[in-house]
């Protein structure tokens, strides 16, 4: 089931984030558990953040973190995804989490645009792109990373 994250979920979200990090193109950047925990606690408690978890059989098998921030050129805000990942056991729940985020962003006062990204290098970016397009998103560019040599 998908539900809004609670403070007690931080450790479970950390495990999901660690799993995602190991599969990402950024895996050479050391993950600092204390920093991750502190930032997740802020996200779960902040009204500017939207954190969902996929809970199956008592375990966190996916997480979504969205945030709003003021656009640098406007008084309007942008809602964007910071983290979006489901484990193999959580497969199939991603679209529902994304729909919940989009609904939250549209209901969030002052949001002028919703930005969705595909930037981790995990999984099939084409599949994620198709999901976003089915939800009405328009592709506007690409992301690049210079991996550590």
PLM feature segments, named:
Residues 1-15:
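A short beta-loop-alpha structural element at the N-terminal edge
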Residues 82-92:
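A short, internal acetyl-CoA/4′-phosphopantetheine-binding micro-motif in the GNAT/acyltransferase core
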Residues 96-113:
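Conserved acyl-CoA
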Residues 128-149:
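C-terminal "cap" of GNAT-fold acetyltransferases
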Residues 114-128, 147-148:
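Conserved beta-strand-loop-alpha-helix junction that forms the acyl-donor binding cleft
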Residues 70-81, 140:
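A conserved beta-turn-beta hairpin within the catalytic core of GNAT-like acetyltransferases
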Residues 28-50, 56, 64-74:
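A conserved beta-strand-loop-helix scaffold within acyl/acetyltransferase catalytic domains
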Residues 15-29:
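Helix-loop element at the rim of GNAT/NAT acetyltransferase active sites that forms part
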């Amino acid at each position: 089931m998908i539900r809004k994250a609670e403070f007690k979920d931080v450790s479970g979200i950390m495990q999901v984030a660690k799993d995602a990090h190991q599969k990402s193109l950024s895996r050479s950047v050391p993950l600092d558990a204390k920093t991750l925990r502190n930032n997740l606690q802020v996200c779960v408690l902040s009204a500017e953040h939207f954190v969902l978890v996929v809970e199956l059989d008592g375990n966190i098998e996916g997480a979504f973190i969205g945030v709003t921030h003021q656009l640098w050129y406007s008084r309007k805000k942008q809602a964007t995804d910071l983290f979006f990942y489901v484990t193999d056991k959580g497969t199939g729940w991603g679209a529902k989490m994304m729909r919940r985020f989009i609904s939250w962003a549209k209901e969030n006062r002052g949001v002028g645009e919703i930005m969705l990204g595909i930037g981790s290098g995990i999984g099939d970016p084409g599949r994620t792109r198709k999901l976003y397009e089915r939800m009405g998103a328009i592709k506007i560019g690409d992301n690049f990373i210079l991996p550590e040599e």
